[in-house]
Amino acid sequence: SNTSFDRLKNIIITHHDIDHIGNINYLREKSKNNIKVYAYKSEVSYITGEETPFKLYMLEQMVDKIDDKMLSMLNVMGLGFKSSYTKVDVSLDNHEKLNLGEEIEVIHTGGHTRGHICLYLKESKVLIAGDLLQVENGELKPVDVMYSNKQELKDAIKNISNYNIETIVFSHGGLYQRNIIGTLKNLIIE
């Protein structure tokens, strides 16, 4: 790979799920830079390990009701989170604007996790959606996870539909560039 971790200077975390924080310590170790990690204020304690991540907490509450396979998965997940906790350098607020080459607006959405954020790049008209939205069979839809707050998801979609978005980038599933505002408004009605 031609990728050099030495080009990396900043990481903005959309939420504290393990697939979003899992390799940050590795990246920090491999880079010659002092990489700054940014996260929404209510996510910081989960990312640093001060609080148990919500999904892990929910699984731990069901430990007496789960089979051996799920218990094994819970143990692996717990170990994964513990090895992934990392320092957060910058705690973010809703509508905070960052200038990291282009102005980036922090949009607190909640829904997927309590402190989930999207990032809006006004000049590029790009929304980095984190795990708020996904593309399934070519169609834009909310992420359907059992721990998501459905009303917060709907409110978040309504909120982001007010931005001038031409491209949505997802954590899982690439890009979406077709009739974004119309599609978002239809998701609000559903």
Please annotate each region the language model reported.
Residues S1-N2, N159:
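A generic secondary-structure signal
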Residues I12, Y38, V90-L92, I107, ...:
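Hydrophobic/aromatic beta-strand patches that form the interior of the parallel beta-sheet core
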Residues G80-S84, E103-I181, N186:
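Metallo-beta-lactamase
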